[in-house]
Amino acid sequence: MNSILREASPKSPHVHFNAIEGILELKGRSIPENALDFYKPLIEWMGEWVKSSPAKTEFHVHLEYFNTSSSKCLLDLFRKLEPLGDNATVLWHYEADDEDMLEAGEDYEAILSVPFRMMKV
């Protein structure tokens, strides 16, 4: 399975889905013109990743900001991890003074069966 590496742009996050190490990362801002176009290949990759039965998956999410359409796509990404149970963890990184981002992570945690860890930076 191939890894994915995309550099950040002013409207889209840095993406590094490392298939060898099982470490997935989204970092930056997520306000693409068409969130589905941006996230669809990532969601499909995640589906294949889960089918490969990885021993461990760490999904680091460190977003400064994301829009509503990105929010739905993030939910779809996280849902793909649910079959992995405790073998997958979402590490939700947020700035110490960013209560909105902390609450967003807690909202995802409340509606999903994927373990989340809130990481204050």
Name every feature range the model reports, one short phrase each.
Residues 42, 58-109:
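Amphipathic alpha-helical interaction surfaces in cytosolic regulatory modules
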Residues 18-20:
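Structural motif
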Residues 10-16, 31-55:
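A short, well-ordered alpha-helical element
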Residues 116-121:
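A generic structural motif
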Residues 22-28:
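Short, aliphatic-rich beta-strand segments
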